[in-house]
Amino acid sequence: IQTGKYVASPGCHASGFIALVYPLIAAGLLDRGALLTATSLTGYSGGGKKMIAEYEASERSELLKGPMPYALGQSHKHLPEMQKQCGLENAPVFVPVVGNFYSGMLVTLPLHASLLKGAPSSDALRAVYKNPYPLGLVHVSGEAPSALYANAYAGRDDMEIFVSGADGRLLVSALFDNLGKGASGAAIECFNLMRGAPADAGLTLG
């Protein structure tokens, strides 16, 4: 990025997925041929002006009060990016879900420990995630939450990774703002790096 003339920042869903999967592959814990599934819960701002207008209309459908899984035909536009940037041999089964809130995103990757070399503990996974992200914009929580709110990082430009689960059934989750670290915040971060500024210059962090 520092020496690039043109830099493309990743899509919002892809940002969370890549942040969770790539470090596992780079560390040799996850095979590139692994068959993965992921869900991503996003605020309705991710759907652009048309969807924002639908959700904020004075007379809107009652159906919009509930979560809406979409792209069920496995044709989401971020899938090729997710597969390519992680070096996966197979595209994941991906379920994006729009929620009744403006912004925020929670990407979750369920993993059986048997998929990971050596069946690492939750603490070992947290250590893996700490190594690739030295710029201070991706944090790794030391806690194992029993619940996460997808809009908790709305208005922020950083990301937090959580590891939870038990009995060999693990969940790794990326919590961030689809409009921040998932969009404009990531673009500003890249611009900062290209011009030799601190990565977090002008960004809103927790």
Protein language model regions, located:
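Glycine-/Pro-rich loop/turn segments that contact NAD(P) or position catalytic residues
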Residues: 1-37, 42-57
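Predominant activation on well-ordered alpha-helical scaffold segments within soluble catalytic domains
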Residues: 18-25, 79-83, 126, 162, ...
